[in-house]
Amino acid sequence: MTAFVVTGTDTGVGKTIFSAALTGALNAHYWKPVQAGLEDGADRDHVARLAGVPASHVLPESYRLNTPCSPHRAAELDGVVLDLARIALPDVRPLVVEGAGGALVPVTRNTTYADVFAWWNLPVVIVARTGLGTINHSLLTIEALRARGVPIHGVAFVGDAVEDSEATICAMGEVRRLGRLPMLGQLDRPALAQAFAEGFRVEDFA
C-alpha cells in the first residue's frame, strides 16, 4: 500500500505542513523517526493538530532529542547514540515519513538522510520553496537523491506561485510537478485541507 518519504530542499521550507496535508488527504499514518528540538513542540504535535487523522495514526518518534540542530549533533549533545536499526520503517500503511532538514542532513557522523532513504526504498516527495535560490537547492537535492538510487515521486512547492522557477526545476530535474501549497494566513485543518485539495490531485499519491 501507499507510503512516501517527505524531504525538503532546506530546513523551514514547509515539510511538516505538507506532511500534515498529505497525511490528512490519504488518511495515512505519520512518522518522524528523529525529532531534534522540543522547545516549540514536536512536529508530530503539529501534524496531529492539522492532519485530522486518528491520534493512533500519529506514530511516536524513535528518538526525541532536545537541541534544534542536525540529528547527529543533537544526539551527541544529549549523550545518545543513534542506532539506525531503530529507524526501520514501521509496518503500517498508508504511511507518510518526514525527514529532518534536507536530504544530506547527517543522521549520524557516517550516514545522511539520503542514505537512509535509499535503505527504505520508498518514493520521495521533495518539498521546495518557490522563492529566490530554489532552483539551485532543488536541483542539488534531486542530484543527491539520484546518486543514491532513491526513487523521486515529484516536487511539491510551498509559497507564492513562481511559474518559471517551478517549471524549470521539474524540466531540468526531470521530475513530476505535483502541485503547490500557498502560504496560509490561517493555518488550521480546514484551511490546509482546502489548500491541498486545490493545489494537488490526491490520485497522484495513490
Curated annotation (Swiss-Prot):
InterPro entries attached to this UniProt entry: DTB_synth_BioD, P-loop_NTPase
Superkingdom assignment: Bacteria
Binding site for Mg(2+): 16, 46, 98
Entry's Gene Ontology cellular component terms: cytosol
Entry cofactors: Mg(2+)
EC number: 6.3.3.3
Catalytic activity entry: (7R,8S)-7,8-diammoniononanoate + CO2 + ATP = (4R,5S)-dethiobiotin + ADP + phosphate + 3 H(+)
Residues holding ATP: 12-17, 98-101
Major subcellular location class: cytoplasm
GO biological process: biotin biosynthetic process
A molecular function GO annotation: magnesium ion binding
Assembly, per entry: Homodimer.
UniProt xrefs under HAMAP family: BioD
Family label: Belongs to the dethiobiotin synthetase family.
Xref: NCBIfam families: bioD
Protein name: ATP-dependent dethiobiotin synthetase BioD
